[in-house]
């Protein structure tokens, strides 16, 4: 009887994870709205958990003025302490409205949290839409 119980327990442990057991990517959209009054101004979203090595998703629904530099920052803490720019290539610039992915090294660098940041290097502008730390599909690459 004990041998059967052990064999059953081993068989359960050897089963692959079901979708309910697997780690779910953070693909729920959160809104962002950045306004830059002039060159040198910056805005950022709240920190969110980044669960996979995928790109970050961004859907830009409004843009005015000069397109800012966009970044994906990483941190080990939900407060953003010790944040680091993890954008592949340093930064991206959104060419217009649409759905995009931003390649980054947040998870590869050992960080667990990500945020989207914008920095105006060419003067005033605004950009808004939705984003998620993990990308669930294939979209136009910004980098």
Task: Walk through the language-model features, giving the residues of each.
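Short, surface-exposed beta-strand/strand-loop-strand elements in extracellular ectodomains
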Residues: 65-83
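N-terminal prepro-regions of secreted/extracellular proteins
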Residues: 1-49
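Extended extracellular/luminal ectodomain segments enriched in beta-structured repeat modules
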Residues: 49-57
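Acidic, Ser/Thr
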Residues: 61-63
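Short Trp-Ser/Thr-centered turn/loop motifs at beta-strand boundaries
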Residues: 29, 40-50, 89, 128-137
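Beta-sandwich interaction modules
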Residues: 43-49, 89-110
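Edge beta-strands of jelly-roll/beta-sandwich modules across compartments, strongly enriched
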Residues: 68-70, 112, 123-141
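Beta-strand-rich extracellular modules
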Residues: 119-121
């Amino acid at each position: 009887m004990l041998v059967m119980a052990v064999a059953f327990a081993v068989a359960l442990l050897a089963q692959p994870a079901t979708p309910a057991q697997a780690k779910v990517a953070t693909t729920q959209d959160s809104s962002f709205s950045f306004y830059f009054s002039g060159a040198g101004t910056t805005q950022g979203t709240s920190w969110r958990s980044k669960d996979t090595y995928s790109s970050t998703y961004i859907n830009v629904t409004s843009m005015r003025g000069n397109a800012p530099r966009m970044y994906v920052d990483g941190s080990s803490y939900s407060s953003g302490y010790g944040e680091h720019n993890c954008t592949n290539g340093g930064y991206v610039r959104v060419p217009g409205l649409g759905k995009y992915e931003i390649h980054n090294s947040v998870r590869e660098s050992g960080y667990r949290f990500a945020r989207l940041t914008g920095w105006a290097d060419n003067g005033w502008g605004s950009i808004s839409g939705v984003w998620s730390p993990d990308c669930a599909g294939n979209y136009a690459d910004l980098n």
